[in-house]
Amino acid sequence: LINEQDPDVVCFQEFRRSVRGAYDAIEYTAERTGYPHYMFQGRDKHKHGLAFMSKYPVVDTDTLFVYPHYINQGILSILETPAGRVGVGNIHLSSFQFDEITSRKDLEPKEKLPLYLKRIRNVIPRQEAEVERIVPMLKKYDMPLVLATDMNAMPHTKMYNRMAGQFRDTFKEKGRGLGWTFHLLGFLKVRLDYEFVNDHVEVLTHNVIESNHSDHAAILGHYKFPGSQKQATLDPPNSE
């Protein structure tokens, strides 16, 4: 998929970094797809975390939030591009991890419902706190920003409204259809993944690309920055 679409930047919100001897999954992926600049941020080298690949050099990074015991985190990478410096956010808000409940064979469906509701009550406050932390941090940057985000939250939630109130949802400008990116509980189609931009960015396209490489669809966006004649593309699929 990456070779087919050939984006300038790729953001993975959930990447399994396997390191065995000389083999490193992110290094291998970057080399096979032609990205000279890449990074992984996770709890340890064998676990899930954020991964990032770019055709442009990374000159600085800013950690938006991170947990010692969760894979969810956010990081802003500052790239040196032909249009000047551009910030690319790779953000993964706290997960509900419903699969842990869905996969339990010892429970009837009616017994699972209270567990789902309890999980929702526990996770939403954490998501709200994450958004409240990252918005003022991102607003400090007076440069083009593109934010690849797995929010684990649907449109019209408090978390989405907070982000959409400060940044532009590219789906609303150039998306088509309903923009579904995830099958919740295996059957309910929802939009959990977004690309947001600030007012320094012109949105050219927003496309949702389904594939069998992940349980989330990828989003491919094309953007133009002030002073640049070249379009930049961003593709943030989740990956395991």
Q: Which residues are covered by each model-predicted region?
A:
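Catalytic domains that recognize anionic headgroups
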Residues: 4-12, 16-18, 109, 115, ...
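Structured beta-strand-rich core segments of catalytic domains in phosphoester-bond hydrolases
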Residues: 9-101, 207-210
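Catalytic-adjacent loop/helix segments of enzymes that bind and process anionic phosphate/sulfate esters
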Residues: 60-137, 230-239
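Sec-exported extracytoplasmic/periplasmic mature domains
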Residues: 3-7, 31-34, 58, 139-140, ...
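Metal-dependent phosphoester-hydrolase catalytic domains
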Residues: 63, 78, 128, 133-146, ...
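Glycine-rich, phosphate-binding/catalytic loops in enzymes
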Residues: 26-30, 69, 105-107, 162-166, ...
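A broad, low-specificity signal for short, low-complexity segments enriched in glycine/proline
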Residues: 13-16, 37-40, 47-52, 105-110, ...
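N-terminal, active-site-proximal structural segment of metallo-dependent hydrolase catalytic domains
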Residues: 1-28, 226-240
